[in-house]
Swiss-Prot record:
This is Ergosterol biosynthetic protein 28. In Aspergillus, the biosynthesis pathway of the sterol precursors leading to the prevalent sterol ergosterol differs from yeast. The ringsystem of lanosterol in S.cerevisiae is firstly demethylised in three enzymatic steps leading to the intermediate zymosterol and secondly a methyl group is added to zymosterol by the sterol 24-C-methyltransferase to form fecosterol. In Aspergillus, lanosterol is firstly transmethylated by the sterol 24-C-methyltransferase leading to the intermediate eburicol and secondly demethylated in three steps to form fecosterol. Heterotetramer of erg25, erg26, erg27 and erg28. Erg28 acts as a scaffold to tether erg27 and other 4,4-demethylation-related enzymes, forming a demethylation enzyme complex, in the endoplasmic reticulum. The lineage of its organism: Eukaryota, Fungi, Dikarya, Ascomycota, Taphrinomycotina. The chain crosses the membrane at residues 18-34, 56-72, 79-95, 109-125. Pfam families: Erg28 (PF03694). Part of the third module of ergosterol biosynthesis pathway that includes by the late steps of the pathway. The third module or late pathway involves the ergosterol synthesis itself through consecutive reactions that mainly occur in the endoplasmic reticulum (ER) membrane. Firstly, the squalene synthase erg9 catalyzes the condensation of 2 farnesyl pyrophosphate moieties to form squalene, which is the precursor of all steroids. Extends the chronological lifespan when overexpressed.
Amino acid sequence: MSQILAMLPDSLVAKWNVVVSVAALFNTVQSFLTPKLTKRVYSNTNEVNGLQGRTFGIWTLLSAIVRFYCAYHITNPDVYFLCQCTYYLACFHFLSEWLLFRTTNLGPGLLSPIVVSTVSIWFMAKEKASILGIAA
């Protein structure tokens, strides 16, 4: 495990993406095992079922894979862009479920993904020029 971490580029954005990816893996596993934590996000728990939970789990796993890959290939502009897109999509999803579809209420289950995605969007935009050598 330490050898894998040693191969990580010397970038706080890369390290952040690894942390977020590991957290997403936990979320993926729990999505397949039980809808309990997913129900903490959405206010209409009748809409949260096994199928929805597993679909959410696959979406979360895909995001984790992209972010983990980005952590190790942080200087590749295409990979960096795709990683940024995962955070924009997550932010859009949770904000639209809250503000547009009204399927969730403002609370810890919603705040966590909104804060993580927003901070990640800001952090990646802020560091983009220094990591890629291009304008944000």
